[in-house]
Amino acid sequence: MSNENNNQFNNEARENHDGQFGHGQKRPYNRPKNYKYKPQHRNSYGRKPMQDRKAPADKEKNGIQVPFKAAIKNSSRRPKKPTSKLKIIPLGGLEQIGMNITAFEYEDSIVVVDCGLAFPEDDMLGIYLVIPDVTYLKENISKVKGFVITHGHEDHIGALPYVLKDVNVPVYSTKLTIALIANKLKEHNMTNTTKLKEVRHGQVINLGDFSIEFIKTNHSIQDASALAIYSPAGIVVHTGDFKVDYTPVFGDAIDLQRFAEIGRKGVLALMCDSTNAERTGFTMSERSVGHVFDNLFNEYKTNRIIIATFASNVDRVQQIINTAYRFGRKVAVEGRSMVNVITTAAELGYLRIPDQTLIEIDQVKNYPDEQVVLITTGSQGESMAALSRMAANIHKKIVIKPNDTIIFSSNPIPGNEKAVSKVINELSMKGAKVIFQDVHVSGHACQEEIKLIYSLVKPKYAIPVHGEYRHLTAQKNVVEELGIPKENIFVLASGNILELDSQSAQVTGTVHTGAILVDGLGVGDVGNIVLRDRQHLAEDGIMIVVVTLERHSNVILAGPDIVSRGFVYVRESEDLMDGAREVVENALDSCLERNITDWGKIKTVVKDALSEFLWKRTKRSPMILPIIMEA
């Protein structure tokens, strides 16, 4: 996976935008002041007491139709009477953005929801990506029945190629998500060793003691799903990443009816997306961005238009293509991740491209500016993304012109503001018109949508997921407003073991979790010590001392020679280097006088003496590496 691909998906994973469209409009909340939340009464494993049950009606009326016969047969099996509590164990994704993975365990069955990666912090120098530590799954591999994936963003699928090497079980998800996973596995030469199982919205699969139903939701990528996880201890609903979009660009709106139907069954717990829990109101529909594109294309009819957006936002790409077609423009796509996702989505029918609309990037120069639209990666200022290379004049095929109109169809992710600002400045200096406001909506639910899902599902317990601690606590506050008791709301940390049934729920312990750092082909071979060394080198540089000693007497035969990298420029610091050599010689003479012959101790004496000297002279502490050779 390229750095461009990494940064692209990292930004999607951490999306939490402000602005006109993402903020939405708050609707009045008319619940009576004396309203008290009352979860529906259920017996110990989530079924209505016999005297309360209605006579069964047709399946289409009481629940979603299951498209496969096998699923219908299996999903109708009699629920197992609960003898144990359900364990929910988040192995990542809480108190952070990215690396989403949660284990659901009941007796001898474990089902894992999502398996995502995170991306390195600024101080993780040289690190390619970060994956969750799945030691718990490896220790209980005989129990693991499969991975169930909610959608195809990197923070939910990105760790699969690494984790499946140790925990090789089937992976279940919807059509587009499975296709994106297959692309990743192909890059790792794992297509023949991994079982990928495609499911449909409404289908129920059975994995050990669990039955799992996929529910249609809306998000910034197609085929996103919520999950209804049925266990003998009760039903848990996991929303995945979602928003409520009544007018989606492609496909159906979120299946709120099914959420309500499951809510009437009695839901033990709801695990709900917290990314936008700090924001009031509703998230605006993706379709609203299309009207903005229409206005911009009409305003800049004679200009070449370049639009930067997230690679996986297929609906956004569809609207750009639709607008370009209406205005008689050809569309070119640039950026590896953008090309991969668009190609896959088009092949599967999730992207509809009119004939003779799409052209190769090499053909852009053959058309007048007013007949071209370029869709590119780089909306977050990623240094190696296509737009950044254009801004820096190092792109091989596209040169920015003074009459270009460049649209950022995204908002800067927290932490990316400087990088985005740098690219905008570089583009503006070339005379381009840069538009970066009001051309984006979020893919995550705001407070009123969160309230809606809770009102439909009516869970006994609330478990905010997907977000930093402030996002989780923001959802906790929203849920308290709905009347769910504080003691029934669990803000968990990665590694917590939450045991629950219809009678009680409590955190009973922890499992080992953490981050595994991936550096090139190395997985887990870079730890805190290596990172500390890299940080030290980056901040203060290194000074290498080379000296040759006589084998028996430890008398200096050659040197000391001093090599500096990243500390000082030797030619301009000759006095400092001469002083450093003198300090090393004195330290070696001191060892000889004190009859210190152990090379390890000699290196320590040299290092301490040189470090003290350099600090006094420069107030800096480079890494010092003594090398002793014998002759």
Describe each region flagged by the PLM.
Residues 56-146, 153-366, 385-399, 418-421:
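His/Asp/Glu-rich metal-coordinating catalytic cores
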Residues 88, 196-198, 269-271, 406, ...:
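Conserved beta-strand scaffold positions in the cores of enzyme catalytic domains, especially
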Residues 1-80:
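Intrinsically disordered, low-complexity RNA-associated tracts
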Residues 170, 463-464, 625-626:
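Short glycine-rich phosphate-binding loop at a beta-alpha junction
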Residues 595-603, 607-631:
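C-terminal tails and terminal domains of large nucleic-acid-associated
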Residues 279-409, 413-595, 603:
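Hard-cation-handling environments
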